Structures are given as C-alpha cells and as structure tokens.
Amino acid sequence: MTMALSTQRTTKGKAASLKRRHTRVRKKVVGTAVRPRLVVTRSTRHVFVQVIDDAAGHTLASASTMEADLRASGDDKSAKAKAVGVLVGERAKAAGIDAVVFDRGGNRYAGRVAAIADGAREAGLAL
C-alpha cells in the first residue's frame, strides 16, 4: 500500500518537527542522580514513561500502557495515561526518588502528556 505524496510529506514533516522540538527540550532538561528525568514517549495508541539518570545512563523506573493490567482496562487513552503516571510515580518512590525533571519529549503539554504529569504528582513525585 502506498501513501499519497502529500501524506508522505506531512508525515515526514511531523516527525521532523517532533524531533526538532525534542532536541530543543533536551538542551534544557538534564536528569541527575538526585533529580532524574521523567521521559514521556507517546505513540498514537500507547504511552511509555521512563525515569532516567542521565549521568549514569540508567533507567530507574518505567511504566507503559503495554502492561497487562492497563491494556485490559477499557478506559480511554487519557485515563490510561494518568494510570501510567501514577504507576511510574509509585515505582519511582519505591526506588527512593522524590523529585524528577519532566521531559515531555517534544510533545505539547496537553492531553495524555499532562495526564501523565498529573498522575505522577498524585503518586507523590515533585515535578
């Protein structure tokens, strides 16, 4: 199946714009061992969240909508995103992390991205 030429240009333009925005955000947002980076990766269907210590290059906690209990729930995408935020917040607290730097990954701070942040705050993380 081939896409129309105009659709290919639009898709490539959106991906390039997202990468450009993420690069701009990453210049300013750096995670440390004391305050790691909470990274949001969003696809059309799922969201993935990681808490990363950039100094060591390690993932300290993670959660996504691909997990069995969240996948089985019949909630909408925003509700699942909020549940992912709560889950990653609880896992980060269990790992001894109280505060994180929020990295929205080039996405707008609205909808599912904002729901993840709200869920993490509910779990007790300071953003």
Curated annotation (Swiss-Prot):
The keyword RNA-binding applies. Residues 1-22 are annotated as: Disordered. GO terms for cellular component: cytosolic large ribosomal subunit. The keyword S-adenosyl-L-methionine does not apply. One of its GO terms (biological process) is translation. One of its GO terms (molecular function) is structural constituent of ribosome. CDD domains: Ribosomal_L18_L5e (cd00432). Keywords: Ribonucleoprotein, Ribosomal protein, RNA-binding, rRNA-binding. It holds the Pfam family Ribosomal_L18p. Transmembrane segments: none annotated. Residues 1-10 have a biased composition (Polar residues). InterPro entries: Ribosomal_uL18_bac-type, Ribosomal_uL18_bac/euk. It comes from the Bacteria. Part of the 50S ribosomal subunit; part of the 5S rRNA/L5/L18/L25 subcomplex. Contacts the 5S and 23S rRNAs. HAMAP family: Ribosomal_uL18_B. Belongs to the universal ribosomal protein uL18 family. PANTHER family: 39S RIBOSOMAL PROTEIN L18, MITOCHONDRIAL, LARGE RIBOSOMAL SUBUNIT PROTEIN UL18M. This is one of the proteins that bind and probably mediate the attachment of the 5S RNA into the large ribosomal subunit, where it forms part of the central protuberance. This is Large ribosomal subunit protein uL18.
